[in-house]
Amino acid sequence: MTQEQFKELLRSQQGELNAVLMYQRLAKVVKTDKERETFLQLAKEEGRHASVFHAYTKEALKPKKTMAIIMPFLYRLLGKKRLYKLIAKGEYDAAIGYEHLIADFPEVESVKNDEK
């Protein structure tokens, strides 16, 4: 693994960990039980994704709270319809970003497929 690949895997792991916290916080502010369950399920999936990257990096990272603070605020400000579009775009962009890692790190393909 090159130094650049390692840095990219670390960035990806950090992003997935940040998403876990973000989805957990969103689950606390949504209005319906169905939305709450959906966000908790997404948090669980993002945790699995982070563990895939952790298997390669062997680094213990902590989630950063920035998005976990901003997204519930945006939920209240923009409403769920607009916010969900932003979240979906972020997930799709992440999937595209993982494509070039698959050749060297095959487990990343499962993460990429989940993100779409």
Region locations from a protein language model:
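Non-heme di-metal
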Residues: 1-116
